[in-house]
Each structure stands twice: as structure tokens, then as C-alpha cells.
Amino acid sequence: MAAELRMILYEDDSVQVQYVDGSTLQLSPCGSEFLFEKSPPVSAHPLEQPERIRQRTHFVISTYREQLQRALDFRNSSATCPFLSETIIPSERKKHIFIDITEVRWPSLDTDGTMIYMESGIVKITSLDGHAYLCLPRSQHEFTVHFLCKVSQKSDSSAVLSETNNKAPKDKLVEKTGKICIRGNLPGQRLKNKENEFHCQIMKSKETLKKMSCVNGTEGREELPSPGTKHTCVYTWVKQCWSVAACPEEWKYPLSLALHFHNKISNMSKIDAHITQSRFLTSDISEERGKVVSVLPRALSLSCPVPHLHRWNFCDSLLQRQSDEYSYPELVKMVWYKGVTYRLTHQNMNSIEIYSGDGSVFKSEGAYFGNYFTYYSIQEGSGKREEKTYSVNNLPPDRPGSPFTVGSLIKQATRILQHCVKMRLSLSHNYRICCWKMVPGINDSNILPLVLKESLIPSVGRFLAYSDDKVHAIFLDGITLTLNWNFSSPIEKRQVNQGLNLGWCKLTFPDGQEQLIQIEHPEPYERYVTTVTSWCRRLTQTSPREMPTHSSSSVLQENWSVASELEKIQKFNLLLENSGILNQISNKKNEQQSFDHYKPGSSETLLGEVNENRVSIALKKTSEILHDIDCLLSNSKK
């Protein structure tokens, strides 16, 4: 079985795995279906299509079971909702539990309970019920969280356990929580309990360590019931790894506990008390104080309700395997390549973190687009921190014997960032349509972005602003420009280009060629960039009533024109029918037709005989009604 060369997790939680022999495996965003593409033999014709196997994940055959299991573990490590098929999970990883676990309760911030400081510098926070725990390493750039999750069920499953029949005996280990345990001796003098806040137990015996609620022993708490036990749920431990800078909502409180506890331990032991990443969540500790309960992520169902939304990428894997250039069809969330992990965040701006595998981390810095990378590392013996900053335009030469090359890592990260910028500037919005996010009966207009503002500037071009913060400009010379602009940021706090979500824009030339342009240095396309950014600033400086909004009623507000025109026609027809003008015209016409037998040519004066006063009155009323309708619709739109 071939080893993995590259594993990619996209923003919609789909996975693509590339193997060293050229074969690829793709997982759907929901994880319920996979496509395995075998590598073509050497003697195969260049136009010959490779063999492809498409199967349901729940019914995978043994040939692809191991590869699929590793791909699912990679997906679940950073996915919003895991996919856990009972047929793929090994028996030793299954837990049969009598209760339905949907949330966990963490210790309060005032009473530091169930917190362990290990000899390696890892801080572990365990929930009061023992169903989840969080581990924060000494570097504090990323953290891992383990939690019990029920395996994926059928979509029509209605088996819900009642609370009265699901009272499981409490684990004895959970009852013995409320203590902070330090594994090994800290450097320097032993901790002193000056403020009577810590009850520390220094454990030296390996036998005692095994009995404690540690990382190796926590997952073995639940005991397997007898095979004949009824009304049990199958659970498994899910391990997820997240960046401290982009912590999900459900893990913010335990992470704030870990940072707070690590800071106390560092201050008391008089070792390195500088917390590099504490700036991300230190201000949020007081806000997260009341959120002691975390709702655990739920596994997706075994079958996908909308499998027609599954998209498969067919490309020349042989050419991509021979070079580091890789074509990513979607917005990337995480990439694993040759033992190095690249983790991206797309919240305010694109940023990337590089985990080389030896404990060191590279982080992209600079406005908008990773112009610099900062290197963080901690020496194992002394615990001394080391920081270096590298410029993308001036990378250091390769060092012989180094476990990794700084230049190659940063270049690979820059290419991934460039791809993410192109995807965010793309007008194709397919990445927003995700199968597991679809709700039955949802309106398709809620998925695609709306046109908030459209302007036609004479001798310049056409400008459009969309509800997903995209701005698209079509110039008269055939060049189109696309950029992201945040219209919702406050005007009083905005700087010159503060509305920019990305520091780059995309130019598309008449021949179809595309080019990324840095907005701060747009030469020789400064005229296009300046024109669009000036239009965006004027749009955001309008009155609050004219400001683009993202309200849920925007669909109705943008589709008012067709309905209003139809209503105008109906009102006008109703006025004509009730005014009696049509009846008079019809009667006059009938009389005239009978009279035309004797006086031909008199039909030209038929309309002139209608009472002019009634026509003017009807037209005046019609004009007033149409004016009132326009005022009403314009006020409702504001």
C-alpha cells in the first residue's frame, strides 16, 4: 500500500489525498462517499483514462479500508463536524456508553480543578465528567482537544435514549478531580503554595501516573459492557488540532483556562513567563467565564441528503507529483506535505502557519499577504524561546544537513496563500454550496450573493458590489478588476484602505489572462486600482440608509422591481376598467361600425369624441397612484 505524499483539507471539509505511486483518494465534504483513482501503468496510453472506484464510505471494501481510515482521521482532525462510520473504526477505539453525551462541563476559572501540568510543559484541562480534555503545549501556537462523539447514524434514525433509563454510574476517577497535578519537578526551586490556591501533588512513581487521569489513560475510562446489553450508544474518541489564533467557539473557554493556568505555573516557577499567544485570548478570559458548558460537535449522518453536490477533481496527478506546483480546486484549510503541516485561517485576512514537525512554527506576518514569516522555536533542555523573521523576497540559503529547508517551506506556503487569494477573488461561488450545510427547502437565492450596488460610470465602465464583500469592475477597454472590500466596517474607524479584506486584487485581461496585483504597489495598473477603490470609499461614505446591508430580507429588497412593475400594470388596468372609458370606447366603436356602412372614413375621429375631461382625470389618478407606489417601495427598501 502506497504512502501518502500530500493530504489536503478544503474549506468545505472535503479531502484529497495524493500517494507516492500517483494514485489519489477524494472524500466528499460530508465524508459519506469517496472516489479512488488508481495510477495508470507505465505502458498506458497518455489518453487512457485511469481506473476509478467510487463507493459509499460506510460500505468500503477491505482493499481501501486502511487508506480511507487515515483520510477520515485527517479530515476529522480539523473538520467542523466529524464523520464516524462504525464499520471503519477499529473495535479497540469504540466505547459503548449508556448515556447520550451532547455537552461537557468544564471547571470554573476561580477554582483551578482537573488541571495537570506535565513534565514536557503540556497543560491538560479535563472536563468534570471526563468526556473531553484539552492539551496545550509549551509553545502555545496550537492545541489538541479530545472528546467523545457518537458514531454517525442513519439519516432516518429516531432512536433517542430517554434520560430515565440512561443513568450510568459515575466514574471513580471523575470523582477524584479538583486537583492540580504537576508531573516531575519544575526547573529551579519547588513550587510554594503561597496563596493557598494550588493543591499540588508531585507524582514520581510510574505506577501512580498510570492510575491518574492522564493523556494515555483518559481514553480508557469507559468500560465495555457485555455484548447483550441493550440501549447502548457507540462512541469513539475524536482528536482535533486547532490553531490558538483561530479557536472554535466551543473550545474557547477551556483554552482560556489552559492559558491562564500556564501563566500561573510559569510565574510561580520563575521560568519563561512570556506567553507568546496569550494575547489572543487573555482579554477574552473574563468574557468566557460563564461559558463553562461546551456543546460537543455532532457526527454527520451516514448518508448524504444531496449527493449530487459532490464534486470530484480529475487532474493529471503524474505531472503534479513530479513538481511542487499543485493545483488546488477549492479554498484550502489545511495541507500536509512530506511531514510538514500548513494550517490556514480565512477570518479577516489570509494567514498561514507552518508546523515543520520538530516543534517549531512559522507564522505569516505583514499586511494582508504574508510578506514576512516569523520563526518560533523552544529549546528542549533550557526551554529558551527563539524567534526569527524571514522576508519572502530575501530567503536564506539552504543549510546542508538541516531537517527542513526554510526557503522551500516559505515558498510552498506563499504559493498556497496565492491560491487562496485567487479563490477569494473568484466570482465562482461554488465553494459556498456545501452538501452537509444544505437544509431541505432552503432558497437558492440565499446561497448566491446579491448585488448591493451597481453603477455605470460614463467613459469608465460598470461597477458592481456584492453581498459577500466582492467588488467587480468592468472597464470599457475590456479589463476587469475584482477585489474584496468590507462595507460593514465603521466609517469613523476606517483608514484610507481599511475596507480591504485582501491586500491584492485580480486583473483579467481581454485575452483571458489573469494577474494578481498588490494594491499598495499597483504599477502599471494604478489607474484601474485607484478608480475602483475610490468608488468603494464613496459607497461606504454614503448615508446609513444607503449603506449596503446583509440583512436576511435583502433578497426581497433586491427583487422588488419585477413585482412592482406587475403591480403597476394591474393597478392601471383596474383603473381603466372602473373608469368606464373602455365601455364608452367600445360603445362608440359599435355605433361607428354600424354608421360606417353609410359614412366611411369617420373612424379616425372616434377617439376624439371621448370626453377629454374623463381621460385627464383617469391619467392624473394613475400618475398619483404610481407615485405613491414608488415612494412606498423606496421607503421600504431603505
UniProtKB/Swiss-Prot annotation:
InterPro entries: C5orf34-like, C5orf34-like_2nd, C5orf34-like_C, C5orf34-like_dom, C5orf34-like_N. Changing residue 266 to R: In a breast cancer sample; somatic mutation. Pfam families: C5orf34-like_N, C5orf34_2nd, C5orf34_C, Polo_box_4. This is Uncharacterized protein C5orf34. It comes from Homo sapiens.
